[in-house]
Amino acid sequence: MAKYFGTDGIRGEVGKSVIKAEFMQKLGNAVGTLINDNGYPGFVIIGQDTRSSGKFLKFALVSGLNAAGIDVIDLGVVPTPIVAFMTVKYKAAAGFVITASHNKFTDNGVKLFSSSGFKLDDALEEEVEAKIDSDFIYQTECKFGNYKVAENFIDEYIENLFERFGSLVNYKGKVVIDCANGAASNHFEALLDRFCIDYISVASNPDGLNINVDCGATCTSNIKKAVIEHNADLGISLDGDADRIIIVDENAQEIDGDGILNIIAQYSNICGGTTGIVGTQMTNMSYENHYKSNNIPFIRSKVGDRYVLEDLVKHGYKIGGESSGHVINLNFGTTGDGLSTAIQLLAIFSQSDKPVSAFKLPGELMQQTMINVPLNFKVTSDHLAKLAGDVAKAEERLGSRGRVLLRPSGTEPVLRVMVEADTKDLATKEAEYLVEKVKQKLV
């Protein structure tokens, strides 16, 4: 079991968890030592989101890397997918992003990409953790690393997307964007300017403390309100590091990651093509049934975009994602990318005069109820085994009308209890039953 890594990097409350300057320095040195041990190119790329804690954590990380002899190219405040993109383009040994994604501003963390632009697999994470807990290594003969700022690399990312989609995007509707006061602030606007999109920007004034506060992909009431106020045709909401995207239609109705994935799957010829789709354990059953009825291969991965990616590679598919808004298209990148996904959607919506709502899955989706149960310990398979009988009873009552999922969060100290059913009342009833059992047996 991982000591430091969760489902999406390492994160926690700054100063009250492992997210401290000392740890970041050790992490940098650990990765730098592994880079040297494996003979990779001696430089890495680094970026950060807008949190006030980002700079001191970044420089602690840089000091550990430099001590190991690794050069660092700093992109400044940039979305996570841009770091992954640049890591691959410039053949860096690794890419780091100082971010806690959609978490509150008091948290921070780090996401780590391999030289191929993928998040680390479990085995490599274990190697990194072992090095963190080993002695700090200084480069021999004082051949320490250098540090360079290169904040204009964002232009290369924008031009790459324009080369691919410039001839396809001709969207005439009014768009509202919510940058979560995060890493996409100003960058998303520059991207839309390049495509000549008529847009209004909200939550794009970061001050170091307001990232994800009442805005962004985890607080869609903000973008819904903006769509109504501005009579917009489309709303696009990103999270703090812009690897998630949620959209709303002209009626301010939300389309989550599953819905976005379904739209891209329907028009995959515009988006590079795929032979199948990867969702997760959280993907609504309605989408699974839709894919099956249209003879589109569909599989569920574990929750977490790194697991979606693993299954994409394993099965040779190109497009996958999560309900939360991580959407991966291996035709264009190696990780969840809110900016690229937004452009793909604009390319699709440009192909007809239909409103955004017309691209949604027809009919009502299966109803989901999810309740987070706070716990002060890490949930293991032994804990879940204590609830197996209760889960079986709920599943028996649901029959073919729904399903049950109990899942420990990889980023928060909670157990997520999710029930899906054909009515909201039934989903809520069974979810509350299971929450009560969790409290009786685990709390």
UniProtKB/Swiss-Prot annotation:
One of the GO BP terms on file: carbohydrate metabolic process
Keyword Magnesium attached: yes
Cofactor note: Binds 1 Mg(2+) ion per subunit.
A molecular-function term among this protein's GO annotations: phosphoglucosamine mutase activity
Pfam families: PGM_PMM_I, PGM_PMM_II, PGM_PMM_III, PGM_PMM_IV
Active-site positions on this chain: 101 (phosphoserine intermediate)
Cofactor: Mg(2+)
Catalytic reaction equation(s): alpha-D-glucosamine 1-phosphate = D-glucosamine 6-phosphate
UniProt entry keywords in alphabetical sequence: Isomerase, Magnesium, Metal-binding, Phosphoprotein
PTM text: Activated by phosphorylation.
A GO cellular component annotation in the UniProt record: cytosol
Residue numbers of Phosphoserine PTMs: 101
Cited function: Catalyzes the conversion of glucosamine-6-phosphate to glucosamine-1-phosphate.
PANTHER family registered for this protein in UniProt: PHOSPHOGLUCOMUTASE (ALPHA-D-GLUCOSE-1,6-BISPHOSPHATE-DEPENDENT), PHOSPHOHEXOSE MUTASE
Protein family per UniProt: Belongs to the phosphohexose mutase family.
Protein name: Phosphoglucosamine mutase
Organism (species): Francisella philomiragia subsp. philomiragia (strain ATCC 25017 / CCUG 19701 / FSC 153 / O#319-036)
Organism phylogeny: Bacteria, Pseudomonadati, Pseudomonadota, Gammaproteobacteria, Thiotrichales
